[in-house]
Swiss-Prot record:
Bilayer topology term: Multi-pass membrane protein
Record-annotated membrane-spanning stretches: 33-53, 77-98, 113-133, 178-198, 226-246, 288-308, 320-340, 347-367
MF-aspect GO terms: metal ion binding; ubiquinol-cytochrome-c reductase activity
Pfam families documented for this protein: Cytochrom_B_C, Cytochrome_B
Identification of the protein by name: Cytochrome b
Necessary cofactors: heme b
Cofactor binding summary note: Binds 2 heme b groups non-covalently.
Lineage, opening ranks: Eukaryota, Metazoa, Chordata, Craniata, Vertebrata
Organism of derivation: Cratogeomys merriami
Function noted in UniProt: Component of the ubiquinol-cytochrome c reductase complex (complex III or cytochrome b-c1 complex) that is part of the mitochondrial respiratory chain. The b-c1 complex mediates electron transfer from ubiquinol to cytochrome c. Contributes to the generation of a proton gradient across the mitochondrial membrane that is then used for ATP synthesis.
Length: 379
């Protein structure tokens, strides 16, 4: 008699995805972040569900309801801080996952990569609308500034902004619909994750060498379930250290002040994981130009499969491209720092140079480096 996991229609799907999945024998710890992202998503949905039971999406009571959760709900403070810091953890894993994809040439699986970019956009949208919900100063002004960017779209811009607001300013209607979006988007993300995995399992995983490994593949369980479990333990340790010892380290103190449309904070800025894109947006002294640059900073990832000029897939044996990759990472760290600084000299010029460098490395230098390396290897 065949084993149930191999014969039952539902269990067969799970079996092919997590148990008998043929996996390259040499994938490193950088491949752990896919499963860690799955864990983060489950964590966010569960903590978010419990928060939604006590939260009220009304401008008069939203801030008070968050205070109520922290003070009067059993372990409400823990659920709230797990959810808030869980978002930061989600983006840390997400950026490492994308970085690994760039380094090892995983973007050549075009369908998987494009679904991944769509997932990044959806996650950013979810995090943005979620940041508005506590209805603190930075929530209100962040929502006002970022949604206002849509008014730069020619002809329909202003109508679009007022349609999203549900009025002539960010108010009760905006908060209510943002709560609805924040509740539904994670489930859409979950569906997209399944599509992401579906496309990935069509081709099989890439590996650090960037060469086919069909002849030496091993089953996912027990080898990689064990390996992923180590990553899970380390992640939970890091996460709980952050939540229990430094719960407000990554937040903004301004968000502990209730939203006031008559009082603008001195520095309006998004959460740390959006600062690199915010710096690129601010580096162009034109509203429409800034919005185009902001969208392009993510959409440029979709061009990577078409800009791949090297005969090798991975950067493992390409020192020139490796140098450019780490320059790109350093540049993103500089952009993140600049995004949190006021708009004044010397930050303006540093931000502009870093923004130009970001696009130049991806669009110009990396494809050229690939061609040079081919030439050096006489390929």
């Amino acid at each position: 008699m065949t084993i149930m996991r191999k014969s039952h229609p539902l269990m067969k799907i799970v079996n092919h995805a997590f148990v008998d999945l043929p996996t390259p024998p040499n994938i490193s710890g950088w491949w752990n972040f896919g499963s860690l992202l799955g864990l983060c998503l489950i964590l966010q949905i569960l903590t978010g569900l419990f928060l939604a039971m006590h939260y009220t999406s009304d401008t008069l009571t939203a801030f008070a309801s968050v205070t109520h959760i922290c003070r009067e709900v059993n372990y409400g403070w823990l659920i709230r801080y797990m959810h808030a810091n869980g978002a930061s953890l989600f983006f840390i894993c997400l950026y490492i996952h994308i970085g690994r994809g760039i380094y090892y040439g995983s973007y050549l699986y075009k369908e998987t990569w494009n679904i991944g970019i769509l997932l990044l956009f959806m996650t950013m949208a979810t995090a943005f609308v979620g940041y508005v919900l506590p209805w603190g100063q930075m929530s209100f002004w962040g929502a006002t500034v970022i949604t206002n960017l849509l008014s730069a779209i020619p002809y329909i811009g202003q109508d679009l902004v007022e349609w999203i607001w549900g009025g002539f300013s960010v108010d009760k209607a905006t908060l209510t619909r943002f709560f609805a979006f924040h509740f539904i988007l994670p489930f859409i993300i979950t569906a997209l994750v399944l599509v992401h995995l579906l496309f990935l399992h069509e081709t099989g995983s890439n590996n650090p060498l960037g060469i086919p490994s069909d002849c030496g593949k091993v089953p996912f369980h027990p080898y990689y379930t064990t390996k992923d479990f180590l990553g899970v333990i380390l992640l939970i340790m890091l996460f709980m250290t952050l939540v229990l010892f430094f719960p407000d380290k990554l937040g903004d103190p301004d968000n502990y002040t209730p939203a006031n449309p008559l009082n603008t904070p001195p520095h309006i800025k998004p959460e740390w994981y959006f600062l690199f894109a915010y710096a690129i947006l601010r580096s162009i002294p034109n509203k429409l130009g800034g919005v185009i640059a902001l969208v392009s900073s993510i959409m440029v990832l979709a061009l990577l499969p078409y800009l791949h000029t090297s005969k090798q897939r991975s950067l493992s044996f390409r020192p020139l491209s490796q140098t450019l990759f780490w320059m790109l990472i350093s540049d993103l760290i500089i952009l993140t720092w600049i995004g949190g600084q006021p708009v004044e000299s010397p930050y303006i010029i540093i931000g502009q140079v870093a923004s130009i460098l970001y696009f130049s490395i991806i669009l110009i230098f990396m494809p050229i480096a690939g061609l040079v390396e081919n030439k050096m290897l006489k390929w």
